[in-house]
Amino acid sequence: MIDLTNCNLCPHRCSVNREQGQLGFCHLDAGLHIANISLHTGEEPIDGSENGVCNVFFSHCNLRCVYCQNYQISQPQSVVKHEITDYESAVNQIVAILQKNVNFLGFVSPTSHIPHMLKIIDMVQKYGFSPKIIYNTNGYENVETLRLLEGIVDIYLPDFKYADDELAQRLSGIPNYTETALAAIGEMYRQKKSVLNDENPA
């Protein structure tokens, strides 16, 4: 059971009570916040998703990248139009895409939303679908949180944004990115025991 009354899902370790509406770095309460669900055909080809990926784009983020291409949905001040806030609507949209012979379900910027991600996966499976799960992350993750996903996530798709902590602080507003992300990627590798690349596709 993931405790959002003392949220430490990500390396910020804000320890806020999201169930009572307290906001940490990501500015998320305990509710479901999905900006978009869509069929995405531009994913990295090595994941083997020839028919595309059903991507769930969560709102908000645990980084503050000044160059973010999704800034309309990722920033604390973002007001997301038509945000999906109930599970049934989300799962119905996902199932409608999976029915089109789509075998991959991706979660984008899922770190602060892991309890919701897990519930969605469970509901999708109860509909009779077993897509491969892609965890698409900025790399700023807690190892202990990633361990909760062992056996659930099929493909980790991390960024490694910085090898320079000064740049990470200046451009994304986060401390100690390099060591934190390397430890997280190491845990992902421990779980999956292989790296997907052009020579070793899914």
What kind of region is each of these model predictions?
Residues 1-62, 66, 70-77:
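N-terminal [4Fe-4S]-dependent radical SAM core
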Residues 63, 85-96:
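Short, charged beta->alpha transition segments
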Residues 66-70, 77-82, 117-120, 145-146:
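Short, conserved acidic/polar surface loops in the N-terminal third of protein domains
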Residues 75-84, 104-109:
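Glycine-rich phosphate-binding "P-loop"
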